[in-house]
Amino acid sequence: MSKRTTYCGLVTEAFLGQEITLKGWVNNRRDLGGLIFVDLRDREGIVQVVFNPAFSEEALKIAETVRSEYVVEVQGTVTKRDPETVNPKIKTGQVEVQVTNIKVINKSETPPFSINEENVNVDENIRLKYRYLDLRRQELAQTFKMRHQITRSIRQYLDDEGFFDIETPVLTKSTPEGARDYLVPSRVHDGEFYALPQSPQLFKQLLMISGFDKYYQIVKCFRDEDLRADRQPEFTQVDIEMSFVDQEDVMQMGEEMLKKVVKEVKGVEINGAFPRMTYKEAMRRYGSDKPDTRFEMELIDVSQLGRDMDFKVFKDTVENDGEIKAIVAKGAAEQYTRKDMDALTEFVNIYGAKGLAWVKVVEDGLTGPIGRFFEAENVETLLTLTGAEAGDLVMFVADKPNVVAQSLGALRVKLAKELGLIDETKLNFLWVTDWPLLEYDEDAKRYVAAHHPFTSPKEADIAKLGTAPEEAEANAYDIVLNGYELGGGSIRIHDGELQEKMFEVLGFTKEQAQEQFGFLLDAFKYGAPPHGGIALGLDRLVMLLTNRTNLRDTIAFPKTASATCLLTNAPGEVSDKQLEELSLRIRH
């Protein structure tokens, strides 16, 4: 077997006149009677190879037998294509290879779906079952090439900045808070379990206490939670921690790293600092803690109408400490029928809204179901507050503030997609800062950490832990890209007494805190430096930089929405002997 000269997708005019050897898969084959054209494919792309009896009758005979997905080796001379056959759609479209020798390395059965890039309308379950075939598609091959480039760029940046790549345990201790753990039973210790890490949070803090100063890891994390299009049970995290830093230091580092990645893999220069917005401002203006700022349509407080109008829904809402907010779809009045508005009402119902009020602005006033409740002065108030003009569609939700934010925030994004308002070429990064430290869980009747229990409160708010915990703000920051939470970080608690106080506010007894986190509390006794960090979702970053819409397309062997692997049929049953060794019994 000859050595490969280069990849198929890299054969350009630089190789003209050269004898080369290529190896790859038959993408397709065209028999023109006396001449056979084969598109040969590998991870770098496709090149056309030609079987002409003038060059080799024997090679032509073998080419007559090859079919799609055969693995072949060809040798031949690179020549320029005739002008009328040039293919500008591919990098190799100016050239072709006149084959003098071909060897069939391996045959292939007919695949369950075409690998050809033009034929991608295949049920995703079939694609996942035969993932090794799906990954041959050029679109996915390029996605994973970019994933490699992104991780390489991240590693180079962090290495240049003096970070150490340090691995942390995969088998660790199950701790409360956050999502459910994946548990691993111990054979050696009867009835005891390890947990797969949801993140290396505690270990990276311990590494700071160990004196390593700058740590990073591109690490697998595991969360047993309900899946969405942008969630997987196992995912990859760019985990970073630094000592002797404040919030500005961490944010600046994260920003510089992301700018470098975007420039190197997308060729896009991001000038200036990323915009910043407080959590409260994001919720007020966009109804989301991860707002998509590629389009406007902000939420507008029109609670004044509830005080001025004789409309019971609005009036009752304001009297019961609720609020009324509106969004304006510019020029969309004629695009949405009453039936469409009924569908939008059902949509906001999902988020707890009791209804969706709406009006259409016309030259002489308002039309729509609640238009008759607007007196002339109410119309003027509405137009002044919202800036709405003739032809605009104005939608209202009147409810508790959190319901208003969630429902209108989601509706805003839905409308933007339907109306084509989103510029898909934009990369809008945004920092969201000044997060609440705690949230109150109505079901559990206790406070829970908004991020995690190790996030430090703002220094001015430490006293509030004992008096008004819900008012305390955190030294926390999230990085958002195009409406997706790309990552989050915080300055950590590094004082044992403050950490114990935090556990107390979260409802832990001293005994429970010691049992679950005693190793961390003990470490704080031996000189813990101030430290903080950030964790970025690598899969999600790849998804956004490759313009994919599904996280599964960025993971080589992903799980389905029901957390199964269709390729290997995992999870699966195990033998009685294995269960016995683990002292386990399955109860159905």
UniProtKB/Swiss-Prot annotation:
Chain positions recorded as ATP binding sites: 223-225, 232, 485, 537-540
Top class in the EC scheme: ligase
Protein name, as recorded: Aspartate--tRNA ligase
Binding-site residues for L-aspartate, renumbered to this chain: 177, 223, 451, 492
Pfam families with a match to the protein in the record: GAD (PF02938), tRNA-synt_2 (PF00152), tRNA_anti-codon (PF01336)
Family stated for the protein in its record: Belongs to the class-II aminoacyl-tRNA synthetase family. Type 1 subfamily.
Species this chain originates from: Staphylococcus aureus (strain MRSA252)
UniProt function note: Catalyzes the attachment of L-aspartate to tRNA(Asp) in a two-step reaction: L-aspartate is first activated by ATP to form Asp-AMP and then transferred to the acceptor end of tRNA(Asp).
UniProt-listed InterPro entries: Aa-tRNA-synt_II, aa-tRNA-synth_II, aa-tRNA-synth_II/BPL/LPL, Asp-tRNA-ligase_1, Asp-tRNA-ligase_1_N, Asp/Asn-tRNA-synth_IIb, AspRS_core, GAD-like_sf
Keyword Protein biosynthesis included in the entry's annotation: yes
SUBUNIT field: Homodimer.
An annotated GO BP: aspartyl-tRNA aminoacylation
EC assignment: 6.1.1.12
Catalytic reactions on record: tRNA(Asp) + L-aspartate + ATP = L-aspartyl-tRNA(Asp) + AMP + diphosphate
PROSITE patterns on file: AA_TRNA_LIGASE_II
Gene that this polypeptide is encoded by: aspS
GO CC list: cytoplasm
Keywords, alphabetical: Aminoacyl-tRNA synthetase, ATP-binding, Cytoplasm, Ligase, Nucleotide-binding, Protein biosynthesis
GO function term, MF aspect, one: catalytic activity, acting on a protein
Annotated PANTHER family: ASPARTATE--TRNA LIGASE, MITOCHONDRIAL, ASPARTYL/LYSYL-TRNA SYNTHETASE
Primary subcellular site in the record, as a coarse category: cytoplasm
Record's subcellular location: Cytoplasm
Region span, Aspartate: 201-204
